Amino acid sequence: MAADLPAAAAPPASGRVFPGAAVQVREARRFLAGVLDGCPAGDDALLCASELATNAVLYSRSGRPGGRFAVRSAVRAGRVRVEVEDEGGPWRPGGEQNGQNGQNGQNGQSGQSGRGLVIVGQRASRWGRDDHGDRRTVWFEIDC
């Protein structure tokens, strides 16, 4: 006999682990596109997720040979939350943390470098960074 789920049951979170190579950022984006189908803010969420996955590959041990990064997402109560977990390491893009964009883009970086978290800060309702052991999770939330 199947148990009845309450009407307000939240959908489960989705997640996947990717090899730490630049080409895998596109695969992470494709994965999330399927999860976020129907979310009006899906394009913004995909852009932000791409920026975080790129940072994981470029600025953490995830980008080294054999490295990996994970992408998790959940859509609940009109809000999407996306997390990108990397293998830690030096944190170079501008010193941003916990929703404060700091000096990103003004710290001597040129060209396209260092702008990813500024984009996340502009598009997301909230974002932050959590360090846990030798791993780091950067997350954002966007209202759908």
Regions found by a protein language model. Give the residues of each.
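STAS-typified acidic loop motif
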Residues: 15-25
